[in-house]
Amino acid sequence: MAEAATRSVGKVTQVIGAVVDVAFEGELPAILNALETDNNGNRLVLEVAQHLGENEVRTIAMDSSEGLVRGQQVIDTGAPISVPVGDETLGRIMNVIGEPVDEAGPLNTAHKRAIHQDAPAYVEQSTEAQILVTGIKVVDLLAPYAKGGKIGLFGGAGVGKTVLIMELINNVAKAHGGYSVFAGVGERTREGNDLYHEMIESGVNKHGGGEGSKAALVYGQMNEPPGARARVALTGLTVAEHFRDQGQDVLFFVDNIFRFTQAGSEVSALLGRIPSAVGYQPTLATDMGQMQERITTTTTGSITSVQAIYVPADDLTDPAPATSFAHLDATTVLSRSIAEKGIYPAVDPLDSTSRMLDPMVVGEEHYEVARKVQSTLQRYKALQDIIAILGMDELSEEDKLAVARARKIERFLSQPFFVAEVFTGSPGKLVALEDTIKGFKGLVNGEYDNLPEAAFYMVGSMDEAIEKAKKLAAA
């Protein structure tokens, strides 16, 4: 703390859990400035939230405030919280204030960046509607992701959210040469640890951030104070913005965006603000908007964000998920009933939506094929009760054909993943958009009515399905 001579120095006057009040003799630090103090040998960062008058500021602690005492010295850093950014962050885990927490040594980067930034000006943003090809058939065909867009990922426990996220990280690195940033916001520490090790096992990252790592991890888990959970998404976003400004197409994952709102609500209550609807903070829409508006495509690069969304009590009208929905361009819904059939990725082709599925954006052919696929699957869904009660024999010939095609489509929507290769033994497949459209076009037009259902399960392109059918016939 030798720099104390040149910076404003204050004293702790009150500690109430995560809220710490600090009094300054001279100039008061600006709102959102980071203050630092030494808490039993550990650096504790406090973020200024309010000016109380009487030369006092109210701050939110980014770590546990246990051990702080009144009268303790606090130094104003003169700037917001700044975190390391750059290629050195790949394969590493850091916390909300940019400190490495993976026991793999210090994180030395050439650049640091403040976590509070303005959204890019409108003139810097790219207005062209483009889709981000993921190489995953069901996503690219039925609910394509917008480059620089926001995607909501819905799904219960154990339906394959993590595997889908890892495959997206892998495919974006392969197809676009882009990096990914994963922000773990208020989720289980065990899951964060599992994800880190699974990424190393599946080759997405190298141990200790070695050469070839494709993703940076930023964690503020459930056990952290609300200040850390409310800011960790911004830390992850700051790392992603640096890659975008280097000309990259970046994938930014947030798991879970609801916890960002929840932490904001806790902080708001601690600061004494009057709560709004359902007890949420009155600044809910502003907090969400400030973060989401930073996720966009600029003339240099793009940040495409995939956000897992927890829906409290399955109530879609709850203010937290409802505020998130306003920002989404696409939704990917994972379904347990599809996972139970053994079809992975278990993306629900009828519930998942995208505003990019528009003939003006994806083209007439893609749009027509996608709509035909959905109508065939919808018809099958409508007939399922009849089949369950009366059996297939009672259906008309036309309906029997529709059911047979729908079952083939269902299986063709599955595909082997690169990141699951180590568990399944099947080599992963990255399918080009043209091959996806061509394959499904043939299916809905009846060109492959002669092939068995099994030929379409867990293959990449239609050529592989035809090969598989030949092998099945020969067996």
UniProtKB/Swiss-Prot annotation:
List of residues binding ATP: G155, G156, A157, G158, V159, G160, K161, T162
Mode of membrane association: Peripheral membrane protein
Single annotated GO MF: ATP binding
PROSITE patterns for this protein: ATPASE_ALPHA_BETA
SUPFAM superfamilies membership: C-terminal domain of alpha and beta subunits of F1 ATP synthase, N-terminal domain of alpha and beta subunits of F1 ATP synthase, P-loop containing nucleoside triphosphate hydrolases
Family annotation (Pfam families): ATP-synt_ab, ATP-synt_ab_N, ATP-synt_VA_C
Gene Ontology cellular-component terms listed: plasma membrane; proton-transporting ATP synthase complex
Protein family membership: Belongs to the ATPase alpha/beta chains family.
Gene3D superfamilies linked to this entry: 2.40.10.170, Bovine Mitochondrial F1-atpase, Atp Synthase Beta Chain, Chain D, domain 3, P-loop containing nucleotide triphosphate hydrolases
E.C. number: 7.1.2.2
Lineage, broadest ranks: Bacteria, Pseudomonadati, Pseudomonadota, Alphaproteobacteria, Hyphomicrobiales
Enzyme kind, highest EC tier: translocase
Record key words, sorted: ATP synthesis, ATP-binding, Cell inner membrane, Cell membrane, CF(1), Hydrogen ion transport, Ion transport, Membrane, Nucleotide-binding, Translocase, Transport
Reactions listed under catalytic activity: ATP + H2O + 4 H(+)(in) = ADP + phosphate + 5 H(+)(out)
Subcellular location per the Swiss-Prot or TrEMBL entry: Cell inner membrane
Stored CDD domains: ATP-synt_F1_beta_C, ATP-synt_F1_beta_N, F1-ATPase_beta_CD
Keyword Cell membrane set for record: yes
Principal location listed in the UniProt entry: membrane
The UniProt record lists the keyword Transferase: no
Organism in which the protein naturally occurs: Rhizobium etli (strain ATCC 51251 / DSM 11541 / JCM 21823 / NBRC 15573 / CFN 42)
Subunit structure: F-type ATPases have 2 components, CF(1) - the catalytic core - and CF(0) - the membrane proton channel. CF(1) has five subunits: alpha(3), beta(3), gamma(1), delta(1), epsilon(1). CF(0) has three main subunits: a(1), b(2) and c(9-12). The alpha and beta chains form an alternating ring which encloses part of the gamma chain. CF(1) is attached to CF(0) by a central stalk formed by the gamma and epsilon chains, while a peripheral stalk is formed by the delta and b chains.
UniProt-listed HAMAP family: ATP_synth_beta_bact
Function (record text): Produces ATP from ADP in the presence of a proton gradient across the membrane. The catalytic sites are hosted primarily by the beta subunits.
Name the record gives this protein: ATP synthase subunit beta
